[in-house]
């Protein structure tokens, strides 16, 4: 399902004809498109109405199954649903800030997706978060990454298995679902962070699902150094270049780091106080307070 109205500019395929991307030139962003509530308001019961609206609007792809992290079958039902209302990825947006600015839509989204399961809806938030939803229990998690991952939450609250499938969904998709059932129209806006050592002005911006990063990042680079653009974080994102230079479906940030191909002769035998190291094999590992400008170089 296309997130907007427009005409197809190109269809890009990779090895073995795998589909890489479909490029759509947007004709009119102010056109809200189809009113899905008016289109399907005769469908009963309510769960089938919700399911049909999500499928036709394309928001069904907001859900991912565990195990396997696939978009669920339209006729399937999960044991439980996990709403990830927090984020611990490096340089990620503050989930609380975005949710509180769209709190009514978020609450409506949680209520609607709860119809898709007979089990629990686990809304997982960071410690001391003020997010509360009437008639739904919230669960707090604390600590560094991966404390904000849906897989971590599932491990402690309702572990999936071959016999039991659970679904996860991000907080911005829940907000979009809430807006769909309030207004009837698909909301394709997303808040993402432009971040990383090569970002000239790191900040949060509003953009659209699948936005062209070539357009989004004009005049956003700190200098002329070779740059690796990552849709997502440095831990879980994908390189966005060429036919894949677009904001990923589940990405909440765009990270800019230096494309570093420097090779150091006999680097393993030098103390290298200015090179980052996790293991205590370089002097820098003992300087806990020192900050490093990380690049794409894995240093072996």
Predicted regions and their residues:
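Generic structural motif
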Residues: 1-10
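Buried, small/hydrophobic-residue-enriched core segments of structured protein domains
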Residues: 12-215, 219-300
């Amino acid at each position: 399902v296309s997130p907007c109205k427009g005409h197809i500019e190109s269809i890009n395929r990779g090895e073995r004809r795998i589909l890489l991307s479909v490029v759509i030139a947007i004709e009119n962003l102010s056109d809200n498109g189809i009113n899905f509530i008016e289109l399907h308001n005769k469908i009963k019961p309510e769960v089938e109405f919700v399911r049909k609206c999500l499928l036709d609007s394309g928001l069904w792809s907001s859900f991912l199954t565990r195990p396997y992290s696939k978009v669920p079958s339209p006729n399937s039902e999960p044991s439980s649903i996990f709403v990830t209302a927090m984020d611990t990825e490096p340089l990620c947006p503050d989930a609380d800030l975005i949710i509180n600015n769209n709190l009514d839509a978020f609450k409506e989204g949680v209520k609607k997706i709860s119809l898709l399961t007979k089990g629990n809806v686990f809304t997982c938030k960071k410690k001391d978060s003020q997010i509360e939803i009437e008639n739904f229990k919230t669960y707090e998690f604390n600590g560094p990454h991966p404390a904000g991952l849906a897989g971590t939450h599932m491990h402690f609250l309702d572990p999936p298995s071959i016999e039991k499938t659970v679904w996860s969904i991000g907080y911005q998709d829940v907000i979009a679902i809430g807006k769909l059932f309030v207004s009837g129209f698909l909301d394709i806006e997303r808040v993402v962070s432009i971040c990383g050592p090569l970002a000239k002005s790191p900040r949060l911006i509003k953009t659209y699902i699948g936005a062209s990063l070539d357009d989004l990042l004009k005049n956003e680079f700190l200098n002329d150094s070779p740059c690796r653009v990552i849709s997502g974080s440095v831990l879980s994102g994908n390189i966005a270049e060429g036919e894949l230079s677009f904001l990923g479906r589940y990405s909440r940030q765009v990270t800019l780091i230096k494309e570093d191909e420097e090779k150091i002769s006999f680097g393993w035998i030098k103390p290298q106080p200015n090179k980052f190291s996790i293991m205590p094999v370089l002097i820098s590992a003992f300087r806990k307070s020192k900050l490093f400008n990380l690049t794409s170089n894995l240093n072996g």
